[in-house]
Design a protein with these regions (language model features):
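Short, charged recognition helix plus adjacent turn
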Residues: 2, 63, 71-85
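Short, basic-rich loop-to-helix N-cap that marks the start of a DNA-contacting helix
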Residues: 50-63
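A short, Lys/Arg-rich alpha-helix, primarily the initiator
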Residues: 1-24
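Key DNA-contact positions within bacterial/archaeal DNA-binding proteins
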Residues: 30, 41, 51, 70
Length: 85
């Protein structure tokens, strides 16, 4: 789903990278939510741009995905395509 135009571009790129990382990990939203102790709707809301993630939530999501939070953010800031190696 496209990210809402109401959220800033940087946040949209971060969300795209997180969503791609989830897909790369072959996890459904419900699987990620379970790892985090969240409801699936919460994952959906941040992935669609309905809700912004706080920094601590971003770190929790990256760790649940097995992705380094600093490396992912560096890729986004460096203008990478949002994918995770």
């Amino acid at each position: 789903m496209p990210v809402s135009p109401a959220i800033p571009e940087l946040h949209a790129r971060i969300v795209a990278a997180l969503t791609q990382a989830r897909h790369d990990a072959k996890l459904r939203q419900v699987d990620l939510a379970k790892r985090l102790g969240w409801q699936q709707a919460y994952v959906s809301r941040y992935e669609t741009g309905e809700r912004m993630l706080a920094v601590d939530e971003y770190v929790a999501v990256t760790r649940a995905l097995g992705v380094d939070p600093v490396a992912l953010l560096a890729q986004v800031l460096d203008g990478e395509d949002g994918g995770v190696d």
